[in-house]
């Protein structure tokens, strides 16, 4: 029983340290270009979906074409319920692996007979631990993946993969930015009358 308590304390300490260093899968530093002073182009992307390379390529091309634009990128967070499920699975996975390794039967604690899968896990500890680890990681990744690639210019949405269902091509993005920049220049040139 003491060992189980020790495993729970250790697992919660690991999760807390991971959460403070990497809140909900968000990279601890934002991806940004700080030397530009113009309008802010902000990307919110699903890093676990592999969109980081796409963002970096777009950032490179846009910074060459529009040197005055400030570009920021950050992870698009999933809904809180999915983040909590992923956090719970992370702790549960560690506790379950610890119980398998130690050989403690948690079902005896509740006065239940151990199911056959638990007995199989005790006979095949390495396979059982690997299966728990990979299955849990698969579910955690599914919970944390949003599929998002959202782009805003000065907090005005210009592209949403969640709405459109696909990433913008480089030509589409450049055309959108050209139109937005022309509109901004036009709006700035209109004299403002006070009433």
From Swiss-Prot:
<keyword id="KW-0676">Redox-active center</keyword>
<dbReference type="GO" id="GO:0042593">
    <property type="term" value="P:glucose homeostasis"/>
</dbReference>
<keyword id="KW-0521">NADP</keyword>
<keyword id="KW-0472">Membrane</keyword>
<keyword id="KW-0812">Transmembrane</keyword>
<dbReference type="GO" id="GO:0005783">
    <property type="term" value="C:endoplasmic reticulum"/>
</dbReference>
<dbReference type="GO" id="GO:0031016">
    <property type="term" value="P:pancreas development"/>
</dbReference>
<keyword id="KW-0732">Signal</keyword>
<dbReference type="InterPro" id="IPR019389">
    <property type="entry name" value="Selenoprotein_T"/>
</dbReference>
<keyword id="KW-0712">Selenocysteine</keyword>
<dbReference type="Pfam" id="PF10262">
    <property type="entry name" value="Rdx"/>
</dbReference>
<dbReference type="GO" id="GO:0060124">
    <property type="term" value="P:positive regulation of growth hormone secretion"/>
</dbReference>
<keyword id="KW-0560">Oxidoreductase</keyword>
<keyword id="KW-0256">Endoplasmic reticulum</keyword>
<dbReference type="GO" id="GO:0098869">
    <property type="term" value="P:cellular oxidant detoxification"/>
</dbReference>
<dbReference type="GO" id="GO:0005789">
    <property type="term" value="C:endoplasmic reticulum membrane"/>
</dbReference>
<comment type="similarity">
    <text>Belongs to the SelWTH family. Selenoprotein T subfamily.</text>
</comment>
<dbReference type="GO" id="GO:0035773">
    <property type="term" value="P:insulin secretion involved in cellular response to glucose stimulus"/>
</dbReference>
<comment type="function">
    <text>Selenoprotein with thioredoxin reductase-like oxidoreductase activity. Protects dopaminergic neurons against oxidative stress and cell death. Involved in ADCYAP1/PACAP-induced calcium mobilization and neuroendocrine secretion. Plays a role in fibroblast anchorage and redox regulation. In gastric smooth muscle, modulates the contraction processes through the regulation of calcium release and MYLK activation. In pancreatic islets, involved in the control of glucose homeostasis, contributes to prolonged ADCYAP1/PACAP-induced insulin secretion.</text>
</comment>
<dbReference type="InterPro" id="IPR011893">
    <property type="entry name" value="Selenoprotein_Rdx-typ"/>
</dbReference>
<keyword id="KW-1133">Transmembrane helix</keyword>
<dbReference type="GO" id="GO:0007204">
    <property type="term" value="P:positive regulation of cytosolic calcium ion concentration"/>
</dbReference>
<feature type="signal peptide">
    <location>
        <begin position="1"/>
        <end position="19"/>
    </location>
</feature>
<dbReference type="GO" id="GO:0004791">
    <property type="term" value="F:thioredoxin-disulfide reductase (NADPH) activity"/>
</dbReference>
<dbReference type="InterPro" id="IPR036249">
    <property type="entry name" value="Thioredoxin-like_sf"/>
</dbReference>
<protein>
    <recommendedName>
        <fullName>Thioredoxin reductase-like selenoprotein T</fullName>
        <ecNumber>1.8.1.9</ecNumber>
    </recommendedName>
</protein>
<feature type="cross-link" description="Cysteinyl-selenocysteine (Cys-Sec)">
    <location>
        <begin position="46"/>
        <end position="49"/>
    </location>
</feature>
<dbReference type="GO" id="GO:0045454">
    <property type="term" value="P:cell redox homeostasis"/>
</dbReference>
<feature type="transmembrane region" description="Helical">
    <location>
        <begin position="85"/>
        <end position="103"/>
    </location>
</feature>
<dbReference type="GO" id="GO:0009749">
    <property type="term" value="P:response to glucose"/>
</dbReference>
């Amino acid at each position: 029983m003491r060992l189980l308590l020790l495993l729970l304390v250790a697992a919660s300490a690991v999760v807390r340290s991971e959460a403070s260093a990497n809140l909900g899968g968000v990279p601890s530093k934002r991806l940004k270009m700080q030397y530009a002073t113009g309008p802010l182009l902000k990307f919110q992307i699903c890093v676990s979906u592999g969109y980081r390379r796409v963002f970096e390529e777009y950032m490179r091309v846009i910074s060459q074409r529009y040197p005055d634009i400030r570009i920021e990128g950050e992870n698009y967070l999933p809904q809180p319920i999915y983040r909590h499920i992923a956090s719970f699975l992370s702790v549960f996975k560690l506790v379950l692996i610890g119980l398998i390794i130690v050989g403690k039967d948690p079902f005896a604690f509740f006065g239940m007979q151990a199911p056959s899968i638990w007995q199989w896990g005790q006979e095949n500890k390495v396979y059982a631990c690997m299966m728990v680890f990979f299955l849990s990681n698969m579910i955690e990744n599914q919970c944390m993946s949003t599929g998002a690639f959202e782009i805003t210019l000065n907090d005005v949405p210009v592209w949403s993969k969640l709405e459109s269902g696909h990433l913008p091509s480089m030509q589409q993005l450049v055309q959108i930015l050209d139109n937005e920049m022309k509109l901004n220049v036009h709006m700035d040139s209109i004299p403002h009358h006070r009433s």
